């Protein structure tokens, strides 16, 4: 980081990791603070319970200005089905800790997850509205569920009431498998 700052003058860093571990971010923050490196940085995380208010403040003190994380669906039932390892209450607590420390929070959200009902979606929208209202998140983006072959859904589609549509044999990327509902839902 020091070499890049010295060579380019750039002081803004986006650390690209879909789920940067809290322990690694703490080590980064401690090192940035000990070296007195005046940078701004942001990254991507899971809203893990180990992101305490104290850790969020330490990250802010080290120059962290924003975090993005996957809330996906604001439903404990669906989060469990997705095997996300977080709860809605935990996400609210962690996002509030980041926001209280002055770190902007962006939430990735989805709709159309297998077994997700219209009511689940309406409830999720209301919960997200409350997260905005209470200053827990500052931005969010909804996207339609996409099935990847190595996700829990892609590995066991029948457990989610879907059947994967076979990909053409010459397909390189397997990031968006088509599927049909076997349960009659859509």
Feature annotation, model-predicted:
Residues 69, 107, 128, 140:
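Hydrophobic, well-ordered secondary-structure elements that form the walls
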Residues 100, 133-134:
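Secondary-structure boundary elements
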Residues 1-104, 113:
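Conserved SAM/AdoMet-binding glycine-rich loop
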Residues 25, 77, 81-82, 111-119, ...:
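Flexible glycine/acidic-rich beta-alpha junction loops that bind and position SAM and/or redox cofactors
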Residues 98, 105, 110, 124-127:
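C-terminal structural cap/anchor segments
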Residues 11, 40, 106, 135-142:
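Acidic/polar loop patches that form or flank catalytic/metal-binding clefts of enzymes
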Residues 4-5, 130-132:
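An active-site-proximal structural segment forming one wall of the substrate-binding cleft
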Residues 55-56, 115-130:
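Catalytic cores of alpha/beta
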């Amino acid at each position: 980081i020091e070499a890049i700052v010295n060579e380019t003058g750039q002081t803004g860093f986006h650390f690209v990791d879909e789920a940067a571990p809290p322990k690694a971010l703490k080590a980064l923050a401690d090192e940035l603070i000990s070296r007195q490196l005046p940078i701004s940085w942001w990254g991507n995380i899971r809203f893990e319970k180990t992101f305490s208010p104290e850790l969020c403040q330490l990250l802010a003190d080290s120059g962290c200005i924003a975090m993005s994380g996957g809330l996906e669906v604001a439903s404990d039932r669906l989060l469990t089905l997705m095997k996300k390892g977080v709860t809605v209450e935990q996400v609210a607590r962690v996002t509030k800790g980041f926001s209280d420390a002055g770190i902007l929070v962006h939430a990735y959200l989805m709709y159309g997850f297998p077994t997700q009902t219209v009511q689940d979606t309406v409830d999720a929208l209301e919960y997200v509205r409350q997260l905005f209202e209470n200053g827990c998140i500052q931005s969010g983006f909804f996207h339609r569920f996409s099935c990847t072959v190595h996700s829990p859904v892609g590995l066991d589609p029948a457990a989610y009431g879907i059947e994967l549509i076979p990909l053409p044999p010459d397909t390189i990327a397997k990031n968006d498998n088509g599927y049909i509902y076997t349960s009659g839902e859509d």
